[in-house]
Design a protein with these regions (language model features):
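Nucleotide-state-sensitive switch-loop elements of NTP-binding domains
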Residues: 2-11, 16-135
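Well-ordered beta-strand positions
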Residues: 121, 150-151
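Flexible active-site lid/hinge loop adjacent to a nucleotide/diphosphate
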Residues: 136-148
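Canonical P-loop GTPase G-domain recognition
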Residues: 143, 151-201
Length: 201
């Protein structure tokens, strides 16, 4: 592997489906590259416990928890040391940070690229079925999460009709003109091409 693992930041509001997409991506990369491909996962929650850690660990992946704060603000000083420790102890090919829903990915990216010395990609996941509610309530943060993204996943397309999905795609494209947009649904797995787009390979 490269001396410097790639870091993938998963951005998106609570309930957008970050953990589900994470597991699909991790399983795809393991199947593609073999069991020697090492993936380290950082789970960030503002609460004192993460409901997703057990699910990820049961799937066979190493999980580091950063709890009781957000890694873009109150825990930002702990992020680079955590990445450095994972790199030294696990020698991963990929580090995935599943950020809390209210995190601003640009802050994390800047911190890791400046002090953690590894390349960073940002995947922002949006819930097509709740798009209008999120836009009304959290438009500034949503815009920041989308503008920073290298790739965008419009998720839960099974809960939205074609018109809604088209509306989301158009709005997303206004906020980020260049990032690839992929679609995900609970009733069908993401394609290998879409998962490769997320991973940047």
């Amino acid at each position: 592997m490269s001396d410097k693992p790639t870091m993938l930041i998963l951005s998106g509001f609570l309930g957008s489906g970050k953990t589900t997409v994470l597991l699909q991506l991790a399983n795809h990369l393991r199947a593609k590259h073999g069991e020697d491909y090492r993936i380290a996962i950082i789970e960030n929650e503002v609460g004192s416990a993460s409901v997703d850690t057990g699910v990820i660990a049961e799937a066979g992946y190493s999980v580091t928890e950063m709890l009781a704060g957000c890694v873009c603000c109150t825990l930002i000083g702990q992020l680079v040391p955590a990445v450095q420790k994972l790199t030294e102890e696990l020698d991963p090919d990929l580090i995935v940070l599943e950020a809390t829903g209210m995190a601003t990915p640009s802050t994390m990216r800047d911190n890791i690229e400046r002090y953690g010395d590894c390349p960073v990609r940002v995947l922002t996941i949006v819930d097509a079925s709740r798009w209008q509610r999120i836009v009304r309530a959290l438009s500034v943060l949503l815009t920041e999460q989308l503008e920073c993204a290298d790739v965008i996943c419009v998720n839960k397309c099974d809960l939205a009709d074609d018109a809604q999905i088209g509306e989301v795609d158009a709005a997303v494209r206004e906020m980020n003109a260049s990032a690839p947009i992929v679609h995900a649904s609970a009733i069908s797995p993401m394609s290998a091409a879409d998962l490769d787009a997320i991973a940047g390979v």
